[in-house]
C-alpha cells in the first residue's frame, strides 16, 4: 500500500509538470524567431548606411558640444590687457632714498586693477649679485613684481645717469622679449608721480600712446611740459599731429610756448612720455625696417623702441591720451635727489 501510494504521488507530479514544457518551448522558439528576424533585416540593409549613420551621430554630438563652448566663451568677459611698469633705480645710490621712491610707486600701483606686472631693475655689486633689502621691500608691497638685478661694473659710478638708465631699461626689455610678456609697457623712474587715470588708460593702447609730461625743478622753480598735440579723427579716436614744449617759470609768473606743431626728434621723445605694446619686440616686420649694421638695432634696445615710436608718430598712428586735445597732465617728474 505504501509503495502504491508513493507511485500515485509520482504520477501526480509528472502529470502536473507535463503541461508547462510546451509553453517554455514556444517561448524559446518565439525568442529565436525574433532574433533571426532582426538579423535578417540587418543583413538586408545597405552596408554603407551604418558608417554614414555613425558619422552623422558623431557630427551632431560634436556640433552640440561646440555650440555649448561658443555660447560659454561669448558670455565670458574679455580679459583686460596686462600693464607692465618698468622702474629703474639708477638715480639714487642711497638705499633709503631708493626705498622711499619705490614705496611711493608701489602705493600708486596697488590701486590699479589687475593684471599688472611691476619690473624693478637694480644694480648689484659684481662680488655680491643680490639686493636683499629691496627684495624684502617689494614683497611687502603686495604688488605682482619681478626684481631684475644688473651686475654693477667698476666704471658704473663714473657713468652718466642717462646711460645707466638706458642700460637698466635694456635689461627690462630683454626680460620682456625672452619671456614673451604680452602687454602695454610703461617706463618710469623713482621720481615719477602717476595719476591713476593714466594707468587705467594704458589698456586702450594697441601700438603706441603718448601724453604730456611735466618736469618739475624744485631748485630752479621752473616747470617744463612736453607732449603731443592731438586731434579727433573720423573714427572717434585721438591721434597725435604735432609736439609742443612749454616752459613755465614760477618765479617770473609767466609761461613760454615754443616749437608747436612739429615732429619730435628721437632725443626729444623720452621713453617716459609714451607707452607701447610689447608685441613689437618680437615682430619681424619691424626689425626689417632698420639695417642690422646700425648701432642699437637690436629689438631689446631702448633706442630701437624710440625709433619705432618716432616712425609710428610720423605715420599718425600714435594714440593721444587722455582726452581729445591731450591737455591733461597725468605724469609728473620731480627733479630732486631721488
Swiss-Prot record:
Disulfide bonds: none annotated. Its EC number is 2.4.2.-. The chain crosses the membrane at residues 28-46. Belongs to the glycosyltransferase 43 family. It is found in: Golgi apparatus membrane. Residues 1-21 are annotated as: Disordered. Keywords: Cell wall biogenesis/degradation, Glycoprotein, Glycosyltransferase, Golgi apparatus, Membrane, Signal-anchor, Transferase, Transmembrane, Transmembrane helix. It comes from the Eukaryota. Residues 1-27 are cytoplasmic. GO terms for cellular component: Golgi membrane. Residues 47-338 are lumenal. Glycans are attached at residues 232, 314. It is an enzyme of class 2 (transferase). GO terms for biological process: cell wall organization; glucuronoxylan biosynthetic process; plant-type secondary cell wall biogenesis; xylan biosynthetic process. One of its GO terms (molecular function) is xylosyltransferase activity. It is a single-pass type II membrane protein. This is Probable beta-1,4-xylosyltransferase IRX9. Probable beta-1,4-xylosyltransferase involved in xylan biosynthesis in cell walls.
Amino acid at each position: 500500500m505504501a509503495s502504491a501510494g508513493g507511485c500515485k504521488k509520482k504520477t501526480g507530479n509528472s502529470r502536473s509538470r507535463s503541461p508547462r514544457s510546451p509553453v517554455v518551448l514556444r517561448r524559446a522558439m518565439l525568442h529565436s524567431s525574433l532574433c533571426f528576424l532582426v538579423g535578417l533585416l540587418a543583413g538586408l540593409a545597405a552596408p554603407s548606411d551604418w558608417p554614414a549613420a555613425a558619422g552623422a551621430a558623431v557630427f551632431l554630438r560634436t556640433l552640440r558640444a561646440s555650440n555649448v563652448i561658443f555660447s560659454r566663451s561669448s558670455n565670458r568677459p574679455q580679459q583686460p590687457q596686462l600693464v607692465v611698469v618698468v622702474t629703474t633705480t639708477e638715480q639714487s645710490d642711497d638705499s633709503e632714498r631708493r626705498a622711499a621712491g619705490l614705496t611711493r610707486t608701489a602705493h600708486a600701483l596697488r590701486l590699479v586693477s589687475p593684471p599688472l606686472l611691476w619690473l624693478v631693475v637694480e644694480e648689484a655689486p659684481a662680488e655680491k649679485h643680490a639686493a636683499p633689502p629691496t627684495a624684502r621691500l617689494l614683497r611687502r608691497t603686495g604688488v605682482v613684481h619681478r626684481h631684475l638685478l644688473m651686475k654693477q661694473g667698476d666704471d658704473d659710478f663714473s657713468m652718466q645717469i642717462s646711460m645707466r638708465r638706458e642700460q637698466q631699461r635694456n635689461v627690462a626689455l630683454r626680460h620682456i622679449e625672452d619671456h614673451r610678456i604680452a602687454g602695454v609697457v610703461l617706463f618710469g623712474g623713482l621720481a615719477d608721480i602717476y595719476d591713476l587715470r593714466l594707468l587705467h588708460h594704458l589698456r586702450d593702447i594697441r601700438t603706441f600712446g603718448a601724453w604730456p609730461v611735466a618736469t618739475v625743478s624744485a631748485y630752479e622753480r621752473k616747470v617744463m611740459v612736453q607732449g603731443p598735440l592731438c586731434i579727433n579723427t573720423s573714427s572717434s579716436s585721438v591721434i597725435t599731429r604735432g609736439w609742443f614744449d612749454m616752459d613755465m617759470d614760477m618765479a617770473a609768473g609767466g609761461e613760454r610756448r615754443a616749437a608747436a606743431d612739429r615732429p619730435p626728434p628721437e632725443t626729444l621723445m623720452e621713453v617716459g612720455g609714451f607707452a607701447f605694446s610689447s608685441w613689437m619686440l618680437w615682430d619681424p616686420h619691424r626689425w626689417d625696417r632698420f639695417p642690422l649694421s646700425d648701432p642699437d638695432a637690436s629689438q631689446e634696445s631702448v633706442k630701437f623702441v624710440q625709433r619705432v615710436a618716432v616712425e609710428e608718430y610720423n605715420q599718425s598712428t600714435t594714440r593721444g591720451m587722455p582726452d581729445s586735445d591731450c591737455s591733461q597732465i597725468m605724469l609728473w617728474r620731480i627733479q630732486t635727489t631721488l
